[in-house]
Structures are given as structure tokens and as C-alpha cells.
Curated annotation (Swiss-Prot):
UniProt keyword RNA-binding, yes or no: yes
GO molecular function, one term: rRNA binding
InterPro entries per record: NA-bd_OB-fold, Rib_uL2_dom2, Ribosomal_uL2, Ribosomal_uL2_bac/org-type, Ribosomal_uL2_C, Ribosomal_uL2_CS, Ribosomal_uL2_dom3, Ribosomal_uL2_RNA-bd_dom
Family: Belongs to the universal ribosomal protein uL2 family.
Name of the molecule in the record: Large ribosomal subunit protein uL2
Length: 277
């Protein structure tokens, strides 16, 4: 997907870049697949901030995405490629032979008019958009939209340019190399889709101005070293003095590379940790 630049009629637009919309079908979204989700602004039910640096952003409707791919044995045709304001990849509108329509994450190479399917037992052609259980996918295949628990829906490799690779099979598990580089065992009964998530150039765009992040619901982030000691462990000092300690969160928890993940039962499924991250 091509990256486009803008005429610099303001200083903020001089270095701003965006993604071309040539691949988007000129067609309205399906109303039955749109729902309103009230913006939390990072607040909980008591109105207190539980996630900092968030706001409502631009008004948008949520697109209901089929992450489970349970339409077994029924072929579907790609009717449209659409923009989704809730995620950084494109979505594809699939029209099935029984008349139902669903949105899925669009992988690279999936275009209007293509036919895809999903199956619970047996294998399908290894082509972008087809979905099947991991135990039926050949070793070495690139996949996305991977389940961690059978029937729960895809949780892994869903963002723009994301993918994982099937590295091996052993009894009821398969070995998958995650997008982070981590090697992990996943139950062979879990579903996955073939291909790489599209819109891989998303990582290369330049935001260009603060307002563009505000549209996305991202508020400014104040450095801890610019605060007073009462507000942050890095605060205080004369001038731009360093904090004199390893980087921590406002609540004193180690950050910037320090491992904070608690031990879990699923740790035994991780074969090797990610490297170079």
C-alpha cells in the first residue's frame, strides 16, 4: 500500500504522511454490522482515571468483526474492502452463499471478488483468507488471527502487517513463532487464518502533528522528570537533573525493559522468550 504525502500549506503538514485509500471500495458500510460503543476516556465506572493519556477522540462506530470464523463449510465472496477507524488494518466484507454478511480482517492478497472459506475438520487451500484449525495447516505456513483458546476467537497477530509462523507440531500442541519472536505452544484445535495482515506500511507513516493523535484518542504524555517530587519518583531537582534511579512508573514499578509479568500456568507453554526487544 502506497504512502502519500501532503502539500505543506501549514508547517505541521510538511512532514505528515498517510496511507493511500486506492484499495478501499466506494460503498457504504453495512448498518447491521455497526454498533455504538460509548467512549470511556480512560475512566472506570467511578469516573476515575484507570488508563492515562486517553480520551474519546473522533466520533466513530464499531465494526463487528468475525474473529471466530465459525461459518464452516460455506463459501464467502469478498464484496468490499473497507476502512475501519477502530484498527490500523483494512477489513473485508464477506458475503456468504446463505445470504449472511460478515467483516473479517483483510490479509495481503485478498481482493474484491475472491472466494474464501473456513472449515473445522480437514484442510483447505493455503491461500489468504482461508481459516482452519492449526493441526491441519502445514509447517512453515504464515498465519494470522490465531486463537489461544479453542472457540474464544482470534487474539494473536491481528494488527497491520502482523503474522506468525507455524514452526512444528507435537501431539495436541503446535509450535508457533509469535510476532514478537517468542516461540510458544498453542493447542492444535485453535483456529487460524492464512496470510499476513494487510496495511503493513502503517508502521512507516509520520503522524506530523499533535492534533492527529488527538483524533485517535491519544492525549499528551508529561515526562516524570518535568514533574514535582510529589507527583512522580523522577520529579524535582535543580534544572534538568536526572532522577538518580532506574526508570520507574509514577507508582514506583520498574519500567523501560524491566520484566513485570507475573508467573502464570501458561508459562510452561513458552519455549523461548522474545529476543532483541
Amino acid at each position: 500500500m502506497a504512502i502519500k504525502s501532503y502539500k505543506p500549506y501549514t508547517p505541521s503538514r510538511r512532514y505528515m504522511t498517510g496511507l493511500s485509500s486506492e484499495d478501499i471500495t466506494a460503498k457504504p458500510s453495512v448498518r447491521s454490522l455497526l454498533v455504538k460503543i460509548p467512549a470511556s476516556g480512560g475512566r472506570n465506572n467511578n469516573g476515575r482515571i484507570t488508563s492515562r493519556h486517553k480520551e474519546a477522540g473522533a466520533k466513530k462506530l464499531y465494526r463487528i468483526i468475525d474473529f471466530k470464523r465459525k461459518k464452516f463449510g460455506i463459501e464467502g465472496r469478498v464484496e468490499a474492502i473497507e476502512y475501519d477507524p477502530n484498527r490500523n488494518c483494512r477489513i473485508a466484507l464477506i458475503s456468504y452463499k446463505d445470504g449472511e454478511k460478515r467483516y473479517i480482517i483483510r490479509p495481503n492478497g485478498l481482493n474484491v471478488g475472491d472466494v474464501i472459506a473456513s472449515i473445522d475438520e480437514g484442510a483447505l487451500d493455503i491461500k489468504p483468507g482461508n481459516a482452519m484449525k492449526l493441526k491441519f495447516i502445514p509447517v512453515g505456513t504464515i498465519v494470522h488471527n490465531i486463537e489461544l483458546k479453542p472457540g474464544k476467537g482470534a487474539q494473536i497477530a491481528r494488527s497491520a502487517g502482523g503474522y506468525a509462523q507455524l514452526m512444528g507440531k507435537e501431539e495436541k500442541y503446535v509450535i508457533v513463532r509469535m510476532p514478537s519472536g517468542e516461540m510458544r505452544q498453542i493447542l492444535a484445535e485453535c483456529m487460524a487464518s492464512i496470510g499476513v495482515v494487510g496495511n503493513e506500511d502503517w508502521a512507516n507513516i509520520t503522524i506530523g502533528k499533535a492534533g492527529r493523535n488527538r483524533y485517535r484518542g491519544i492525549r499528551p504524555q508529561t515526562r516524570g522528570s518535568a514533574m514535582n517530587p510529589v507527583d512522580h519518583p523522577h520529579g524535582g531537582g535543580e534544572g534538568k537533573k536526572n532522577s538518580g534511579r532506574h526508570p520507574v512508573t509514577p507508582w514506583g514499578k520498574p519500567t523501560k525493559g524491566a520484566k513485570t509479568r507475573r508467573k502464570k500456568a501458561s508459562d510452561k507453554l513458552i519455549i523461548s522468550r522474545r529476543k532483541g526487544k
